[in-house]
Amino acid sequence: MAKGQSLQDPFLNALRRERIPVSIYLVNGIKLQGQIESFDQFVILLKNTVSQMVYKHAISTVVPARAVNHHQHVPGAAGEEQGEAEA
């Protein structure tokens, strides 16, 4: 797994698990709102009245509606070695 995903995956997974509403801002300035239904290496499935597949390369910022507790012990955090993890 890429080092950049060692923060991304636990953060997105906490948003998904806790069904926290999010605002996703795209690089072109468009704001999308909903709940993260699922995600993988390349896309986020955002659910509102419909489900939208949003490509991660088009995302600028993900803003949760409330604070997120994503600080679980994750192998690879604080410079530890990390193996392949599930999303």
Curated annotation (Swiss-Prot):
<dbReference type="Pfam" id="PF17209">
    <property type="entry name" value="Hfq"/>
</dbReference>
<dbReference type="GO" id="GO:0045974">
    <property type="term" value="P:regulation of translation, ncRNA-mediated"/>
</dbReference>
<keyword id="KW-0346">Stress response</keyword>
<comment type="subunit">
    <text>Homohexamer.</text>
</comment>
<dbReference type="InterPro" id="IPR005001">
    <property type="entry name" value="Hfq"/>
</dbReference>
<dbReference type="InterPro" id="IPR010920">
    <property type="entry name" value="LSM_dom_sf"/>
</dbReference>
<dbReference type="GO" id="GO:0043487">
    <property type="term" value="P:regulation of RNA stability"/>
</dbReference>
<dbReference type="InterPro" id="IPR047575">
    <property type="entry name" value="Sm"/>
</dbReference>
<dbReference type="GO" id="GO:0006355">
    <property type="term" value="P:regulation of DNA-templated transcription"/>
</dbReference>
<comment type="similarity">
    <text>Belongs to the Hfq family.</text>
</comment>
<feature type="domain" description="Sm">
    <location>
        <begin position="9"/>
        <end position="68"/>
    </location>
</feature>
<comment type="function">
    <text>RNA chaperone that binds small regulatory RNA (sRNAs) and mRNAs to facilitate mRNA translational regulation in response to envelope stress, environmental stress and changes in metabolite concentrations. Also binds with high specificity to tRNAs.</text>
</comment>
<keyword id="KW-0694">RNA-binding</keyword>
<dbReference type="GO" id="GO:0005829">
    <property type="term" value="C:cytosol"/>
</dbReference>
<dbReference type="GO" id="GO:0003723">
    <property type="term" value="F:RNA binding"/>
</dbReference>
<protein>
    <recommendedName>
        <fullName>RNA-binding protein Hfq</fullName>
    </recommendedName>
</protein>
